[in-house]
């Protein structure tokens, strides 16, 4: 049987039809029908079948590795911060924060014009997107083994700074979609596996696709752009080689069999080409921002979004540099505040080994006969500059805001730095050489220990979040029950357009409610939990009002009048003549709060008598 007969026969077997068409139109035209070519066709078909099995195994392994960290969080089914207010009122609200793609995605999952609680489906979809990116890394970065892809991809998504991102029952999907879009934009521009169809495409098509993905990332979640910046710098840092070494290696791999095995074509990876690639990516980022900023100005609404969306003035250069220095110091403090000693040491070790190897490689892969000293100096200085630029790239354009908010959820570039450094340092022909076998084992060992630490952090966060949510829910019910006994007007119909009650009852919280007993140890010992565990019942906290509304106080609103706030604090609420104590527990111990209606304001006081006495003696 000839190759042409086999191609026609296999055309009826579903997934083999593509291979059959290729063999009929390409292979049969290029080769003479001999037994050697028949064996080549069988090898291509077997390779396709093997790759499909390997891809399924990689996807299942990625789902399992990510699931170890995400399943405990998803099983809690706790509404986190914005989820509570969105569930109560049924509003979307992402468009007001200049995230139209996020709102569009969630409206596709909704029922009409109001948001319906479909949790945990958005979180499950985010889990699937995160796992699927391991396949993209495997296909776009030649030389990566499936195990390294699974491990590196897990380090990208499971970090102490993505706890909030996956905790949101709704926002987890747009955030994950934005991160995946930014990563895909970087990988599309990276030289990877190119087939005959891809080689015939025009050069501008990858850039146009990357620009669209960057715009999608900005419209889903603005900090996702930082992932693209970090991966671009890592690609330049770990992918550039001197022209002499590049030319010699190209001559060594000049046979068709070696090209087929490597799965890529030879392309220039010199320092100059790396600089040109960085300039190209910088131009794409600038173009995406120029397209996005006018859109954001049209969509942004609300005091909070407008306040934190203003840019620094570019007219005063000294003031601009001082503001950038201050913002960078605040960002680094937020970074240190989310890392415990073990995770910080492991992360630092991984980055030092991976980036250090990239910086040291320039002087060890060649000798002076192959590359001039000027090229060596240029390469070393370029690599050092790229490594230093990784620090501001973690926050990207956020540093240019007048009042940036460095929440932990915005530091999504940290995972891209860890996972990208691991995978790009182990990718390629050089990383598989025997001279770097020790480095490979060291990187994989540190990365595995770091992933184990991140699993523990996710487990601690999941349990602490569940305990705190249950504690605040019970506390809100007790407050509302006592308010009804006191005859406070806590219920009122709400307007469906403005989401405000017809008869408002302003709420002022004094003091701070204690944390849940089951969450106190985790809050003390795990910095990531302490950074993300937000107590609702604190002064001037909107989430306290949301908690009370969930317990049945539909008339509650947050008191925003500063003069009324100052008048309510004097005399102290802990004065027995001005408050009504809550009934005690069964054991006879008093409750932790008191409440009263003062000047038309619902005052809830968590201050103890000891704190009030201390406040009285202060000057």
Segments the model singles out, each with a brief description of its role:
Residues 14, 18, 22-68:
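Start-transfer (signal-anchor) and selected internal transmembrane alpha helices
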Residues 31, 35-52, 194-202, 241-277, ...:
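Membrane-interfacial, low-structure loops and terminal tails that flank and connect transmembrane helices
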Residues 44-96, 100, 106, 110-150, ...:
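Intrinsically disordered, polar/acidic, low-complexity terminal segments
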Residues 67-124, 130, 151-153, 169, ...:
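Transmembrane catalytic cores of multi-pass membrane glycosyltransferases
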Residues 136-141, 186-194, 233-242, 356-369, ...:
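Structural signal for the C-terminal ends of transmembrane alpha-helices
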Residues 152-160:
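Short helix- or helix-capping micro-motifs
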Residues 176-196, 209-213, 231-232, 236-238, ...:
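Specific aromatic-rich, kink-prone transmembrane helix
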Residues 427-457:
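Signature aromatic-anchored transmembrane alpha helix within multi-pass, membrane-resident enzymes
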